UniProtKB/Swiss-Prot annotation:
This is Bifunctional protein FolD. Pathway: One-carbon metabolism; tetrahydrofolate interconversion. Catalyzes the oxidation of 5,10-methylenetetrahydrofolate to 5,10-methenyltetrahydrofolate and then the hydrolysis of 5,10-methenyltetrahydrofolate to 10-formyltetrahydrofolate. The lineage of its organism: Bacteria, Bacillati, Bacillota, Clostridia, Eubacteriales. It comes from Clostridium novyi (strain NT). Gene3D superfamilies: Leucine Dehydrogenase, chain A, domain 1 (3.40.50.10860), NAD(P)-binding Rossmann-like Domain (3.40.50.720).
Length: 278
């Protein structure tokens, strides 16, 4: 029987430390922590994430400028708003909720964010620095995943890691972070052949595909660490990519959904915000 990785507990431990950091920063008369949160349209998942961010920021004493924009906004208008925030000395971090409406150029807009305020690591420069192993803001969900893996009794260095999913937000950056930790990394996707055989070789298996209960015990190596990033709604209940109850019988460690990776994402955002002032 494996161990459930308690993301909520780890996130809470980190938040306690962050609260002290925020208090120290805010006690400095010249610096007050303030974050700008841009939401274009009314995507349900983004709205949920924004609410969680606001709740945590309020609890920690961080000011948030919520900028809610119509989904029909012109690209030039959005770029102007980002430029204003880049030049706003009060704002120490900017987060742009994704996905954006299809008429907006996501790459162009995320890259307009000042690299020193890009606390979700979305800009092309931030991505380039990540892949070169240089200091940068690391995307929040991938950073949270690495923090969770490091709580397990496994050496990332020298391990075989398999990442299912190649999104720019999770799959690609978490694969790069694992590579930076000297794991041997395989990225799988919808065109991958022999997926099950590849997964069975994984010491660390990260699934980020959004297919409910896709990963059964037949995909998991005995004693592996399994990180479930996927979220889907099934009969009004949030579930992950992994069949938790059967996989935990075979794996050494498994993250639940909810209560695993999701609990870490917002926490890593605030950690990035605080570290940006150092």
């Amino acid at each position: 029987m494996g161990i459930k990785i308690d993301g909520k507990r780890l996130a809470q431990d980190i938040r306690e430390e962050l609260k002290k950091q925020v208090e120290n920063i805010n006690n400095n008369e010249d610096v007050k922590l303030c974050m700008a949160n841009i939401l274009v349209g009314n995507d349900g998942g983004s709205q949920f994430y924004v609410r969680n961010q606001n709740k945590l920021c309020h609890a920690l004493g961080i000011k948030v400028k919520n900028i809610n924009l119509d989904e029909c906004i012109k690209e030039e208008e959005l770029l102007n708003i980002i430029n204003e925030l880049n030049n706003d000395n009060e704002v120490k971090g900017i987060i742009l909720q994704l996905p954006l409406p299809k008429h907006l150029d996501e790459s162009k807009i995320t890259s307009a964010i000042d690299i020193n305020k890009d606390i979700d690591g979305l800009s092309s420069i931030s991505v380039g620095k990540l892949y070169k192993g240089e200091k940068c803001f690391v995307p929040c969900t991938p950073r949270g995943i690495i923090e969770l893996i490091k709580t397990c009794d496994i050496d990332i260095e020298g391990s075989n890691a398999v990442v299912i999913g190649r999104s720019n937000i999770v799959g690609k950056p978490v694969a790069q972070l694992l590579l930076n930790e000297n794991a041997t990394v395989t990225i799988c996707h919808s065109k991958t052949k022999n997926l099950k055989e590849i997964c069975l070789n994984a010491d660390i298996l990260v699934s980020a595909i959004g297919k409910p209960h896709f990963i059964t015990k037949d995909y998991v190596k005995e004693g592996a660490v399994v990180i479930d990033v996927g979220t889907s709604s099934v009969n009004g209940k949030m579930v992950g990519d992994v069949c938790f109850d059967e996989v935990i019988e075979k794996a050494a460690y498994v993250t639940p959904v909810p209560g695993g990776v999701g609990a870490m994402t917002t926490t890593m955002l605030i950690k990035n915000l605080c570290e940006g002032l150092k």
